[in-house]
UniProtKB/Swiss-Prot annotation:
This is 3-hydroxyacyl-[acyl-carrier-protein] dehydratase FabZ. Its EC number is 4.2.1.59. Involved in unsaturated fatty acids biosynthesis. Catalyzes the dehydration of short chain beta-hydroxyacyl-ACPs and long chain saturated and unsaturated beta-hydroxyacyl-ACPs. It catalyses: a (3R)-hydroxyacyl-[ACP] = a (2E)-enoyl-[ACP] + H2O. Disulfide bonds: none annotated. The active site is at H58. It is an enzyme of class 4 (lyase). One of its GO terms (biological process) is fatty acid biosynthetic process. GO terms for cellular component: cytoplasm; membrane. Belongs to the thioester dehydratase family. FabZ subfamily. It is found in: Cytoplasm. It comes from Brucella abortus (strain 2308).
Amino acid sequence: MSDDNQTKLEAADIQALLAVLPHRYPFLLIDRIVDIDGDVSATGIKNVTINEPHFTGHFPENPIMPGVLIVEAMAQTAGAISLLQRKTGRPGVVYFMTIDNAKFRRPVVPGDRLLLYVKKIKQRANISKYECVAEVDGVKVAEAEVAAMISVADENL
């Protein structure tokens, strides 16, 4: 328990993610978040399946998850923990602002379980920057720094 007598959120299932993120199929790219430490860090989980629509064209004979979708999954993980920790009842939207230092180290393919580690490295007003690493079976497959802004109508952030 935290000092304000509220239960500390340690994980978020798909229903919790659907409650805070505006993304839906086929663009909701995380299935669950675990190891949540406030809005500071967490681990997102993406189970990669052959049924995802991008595999029909990327690439038909050798399906590989597009790198841009791996970065988007990282950003969704960071955005979700920011929204899950909000103290107000007002809905918020997280806008992806920047991608820096993105590197892709190995392909992600159907059957992989993508672990998305995000850690806040900077906060200024309603803008946060996160260091992100994606791994499959303990091997780093991608990394990036992403920045995002929470926007809420009629709220001073």
